[in-house]
Amino acid sequence: MASSTATMLKASPVKSDWVKGQSLLLRQPSSVSAIRSHVAPSALTVRAASAYADELVKTAKTIASPGHGIMAMDESNATCGKRLASIGLENTEANRQAYRTLLVSAPGLGQYISGAILFEETLYQSTTDGKKMVDVLVEQNIVPGIKVDKGLVPLVGSYDESWCQGLDGLASRTAAYYQQGARFAKWRTVVSIPNGPSALAVKEAAWGLARYAAISQDSGLVPIVEPEIMLDGEHGIDRTYDVAEKVWAEVFFYLAQNNVMFEGILLKPSMVTPGAEATDRATPEQVASYTLKLLRNRIPPAVPGIMFLSGGQSELEATLNLNAMNQAPNPWHVSFSYARALQNTCLKTWGGKEENVKAAQDILLARAKANSLAQLGKYTGEGESEEAKEGMFVKGYTY
């Protein structure tokens, strides 16, 4: 418990320095002390760490285990419908159930996948054989997780940007999800570079993530912190890096204010890449260099795992970039939390036909194994199909 409480910081009355136009690194400790000196000690007392503190640390470490990553299968029913439509299937509960059954029941999936993010329908759903999806995952030593945000809505007063809703009622929902078997949670918000990002949008994203993280930990769920920096735009990799630095500085400022235990969280950042419409592309080595520099400058080593999103990269590109980041030791477990970059070829292979289930599962396992090797820094790229090289960027993508 001592190590868990080491990162439990007292809430500070100082507002975000970056929002005020100043560098987070220039904050003067003396000013904080001066403000605190006028406040009664009892007013500064924060609530004790979550009763689940030890379990949170254990869950986070289990997910962030060598050679393992997360399979994101938490698409909303509407987004799942788009995936099904791409192979000529209607968006019905039966079809969604059939596809999700294919994913969770792939034999040996737990060799490479340590966690699976589910949509709420899936958390309470059974497979086509009548077994609970959660139980099937647990049998494969895969930790069930749950998407808890309620999606993006326009952020009034911003540069046509968005904010993520879902804090209302979150405490009761996360408690219920824990009882249903979930042990970690995900909240996705986005930052758009072509539209700014405005200080308002970054602050709103960071504050929402911090409140969600604190509430999730209080319910026993390890929060995945995901401020996705969208690939949309023609900007270069340096612009992405600058924005990412500001976003993560803001996120950790508010995580600390909300007394979030860093040893009991996981991060799901975007890799630092040029905009999808930029003329200059980056090599895996360049992506790794910029991304690792960002992590070293902004992410405390107390965080156990960094599970990258693919963000519309091709299956092959996402794996190559991850492999490049694991060519030298890192203070965190650097891995993956992929959806399309794990499932795209699998979905096409299945095509909604029962006779194709095994072939589709074999494709899924091959893709999961490739990323497992990349997490270990041992991926070679041999034997990849042309489909794995196809980009999946969608402008203005919604999840």
Curated annotation (Swiss-Prot):
Enzyme Commission number, as recorded: 4.1.2.13
Induction: By sucrose. Induced by drought stress.
Residues reported in the UniProt entry to bind substrate: 96, 186, 310-312
Pathway: Carbohydrate degradation; glycolysis; D-glyceraldehyde 3-phosphate and glycerone phosphate from D-glucose: step 4/4
Organelle transit peptide: 1-48
Annotated GO biological process: gluconeogenesis; glycolytic process
Site feature: Necessary for preference for fructose 1,6-bisphosphate over fructose 1-phosphate: 399
Catalytic center residues: 226, 268
InterPro entries hit by this protein: Aldolase_I_AS (IPR029768), Aldolase_TIM (IPR013785), FBA_I (IPR000741)
Subcellular compartments: Plastid, Chloroplast, Plastoglobule; Plastid, Chloroplast stroma
Residue ranges the record marks as coiled coil: none
GO molecular function: fructose-bisphosphate aldolase activity
PTM (free text): Can be trimethylated at Lys-395 by LSMT-L, but the trimethylation has no effect in vitro on the kinetic properties of the enzyme. S-glutathionylated.
CDD domains: FBP_aldolase_I_a
Sorted UniProt keywords: Chloroplast, Glutathionylation, Glycolysis, Lyase, Methylation, Phosphoprotein, Plastid, Schiff base, Transit peptide
Residues annotated with N6,N6,N6-trimethyllysine modification: 395
Pfam families: Glycolytic
Function recorded in the entry: Plays a key role in glycolysis and gluconeogenesis.
Family note: Belongs to the class I fructose-bisphosphate aldolase family.
Name of this protein: Fructose-bisphosphate aldolase 1, chloroplastic
